[in-house]
């Protein structure tokens, strides 16, 4: 690898072969894997997330697995903070950070940074709400046009919640919401080699998704979800339970879907997720594409990383 302080990222839709490639690379490079997956963070959710096995985790150190209970939340800002700290720690120990996953919101937070918007202030919000009742929404929207015309143009005049929030941000920060949104913080500044793994033909990805879903159902996945279903503190609106596969099995256990309906909807939802992932990847700069199943994939990655990261990322 040419750039010694570089980070490697392997993107890809679900069931594309990211895990296999990452483990193969770890045999050649002294890597530690940082999971970039919003479902793998949860304890007790192993089968439906295709979590790396204990054997795989023993072969290569994995990070950001099993760090939250399913009742808890984990934001893109949480990931950004944790990933940056892990990257520094891994490199300080002389190893290579390898980011692997398909949660594109997390990747975006890490690579582009996040906007730091002020938290809601009760006193400011109460004052603005009182003005809303006294002067009306049109007056507040007119005020927003003066201090933040871009937000005023974007926000519908009949949307009180967003108008109040935009004015609240301006009063707290002294800057318009538009300006604060453009200001990004916490982005990765180290060189990065980015690879995306996906089949050339969509039907191949669909076949792999269906095979993975059926493999999941052949394991005690129903029992895994039943354990979650039995917990009184969990409900279907939590991010953990909304995860693809878990949502549909939860509905099956609740009597809302038959087994066949659960399977069909789970496969469709996984395909839709993969489509969103592919759409994001096609628009992301600096990504080098690899075809799922290419026997020379690992060698192509190693060859590509002989270039300086700056040159690597300048190519389409």
UniProtKB/Swiss-Prot annotation:
How it assembles, according to the record, is: Monomer.
Gene3D superfamilies reported in the protein's UniProt record? 1.10.20.140, P-loop containing nucleotide triphosphate hydrolases
HAMAP family recorded? IPP_trans
Q: What is this protein called?
A: tRNA dimethylallyltransferase
Describe the reaction catalysed, as an equation.
adenosine(37) in tRNA + dimethylallyl diphosphate = N(6)-dimethylallyladenosine(37) in tRNA + diphosphate
Keywords of the record, alphabetical order, are: ATP-binding, Magnesium, Nucleotide-binding, Transferase, tRNA processing
One GO biological process this protein is involved in is: tRNA modification
Give its E.C. classification number: 2.5.1.75
Q: Where is this region: Interaction with substrate tRNA?
A: 37-40, 161-165
Q: Which GO terms describe its molecular function?
A: ATP binding; tRNA dimethylallyltransferase activity
Annotated binding of substrate, by residue: 14-19
Which purpose does this protein serve, as stated in its record?
Catalyzes the transfer of a dimethylallyl group onto the adenine at position 37 in tRNAs that read codons beginning with uridine, leading to the formation of N6-(dimethylallyl)adenosine (i(6)A).
Q: Where does the chain bind ATP?
A: 12-19
In the record, the note on similarity to other proteins reads:
Belongs to the IPP transferase family.
Record-marked site positions (Interaction with substrate tRNA): 103, 125
Q: Which gene encodes it?
A: miaA
Query: Which cofactors must be present for this protein to function?
Result: Mg(2+)
Q: Which residues, if any, are the signal sequence?
A: none
């Amino acid at each position: 690898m040419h750039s010694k302080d570089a980070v490697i990222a392997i993107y890809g839709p679900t069931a594309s072969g990211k895990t296999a490639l990452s483990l193969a690379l770890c045999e050649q490079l002294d890597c530690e894997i940082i999971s970039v997956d919003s479902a793998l963070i949860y304890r007790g959710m192993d089968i439906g997330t295709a979590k790396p096995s204990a054997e795989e985790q023993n072969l290569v150190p994995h990070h950001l697995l099993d760090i939250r209970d399913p009742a808890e939340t984990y934001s893109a800002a949480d990931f950004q903070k944790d990933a940056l700290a892990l990257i520094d720690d891994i490199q300080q120990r002389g190893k290579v950070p390898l980011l692997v996953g398909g949660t594109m919101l997390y990747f975006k937070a890490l690579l582009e940074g996040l906007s730091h918007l002020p938290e809601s202030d009760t006193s400011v919000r109460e004052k603005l709400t009182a003005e809303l009742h006294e002067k009306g929404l049109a007056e507040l929207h007119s005020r927003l046009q003066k201090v933040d015309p871009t937000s005023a143009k974007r926000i519908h005049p009949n949307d009180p919640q967003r108008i109040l929030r935009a004015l609240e941000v301006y009063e707290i920060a002294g800057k318009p919401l538009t300006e604060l949104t453009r200001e990004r913080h916490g982005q990765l500044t180290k060189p990065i080699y980015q690879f995306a793994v996906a089949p050339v033909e969509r039907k191949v990805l669909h076949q792999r998704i269906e095979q993975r879903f059926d493999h999941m159902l052949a394991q005690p996945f129903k029992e895994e979800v039943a354990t979650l279903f039995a917990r009184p503190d969990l409900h279907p609106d939590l991010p953990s339970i909304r995860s693809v596969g878990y949502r549909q099995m939860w509905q099956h256990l609740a009597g809302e879907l038959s087994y066949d309906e659960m399977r069909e909807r789970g496969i469709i939802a996984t395909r839709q997720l993969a489509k969103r992932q592919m759409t994001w990847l096609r628009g992301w700069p600096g990504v080098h594409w690899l075809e799922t199943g290419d026997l020379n994939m690992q060698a192509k990655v190693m060859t590509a990383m002989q270039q300086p990261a700056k040159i690597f990322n300048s190519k389409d």
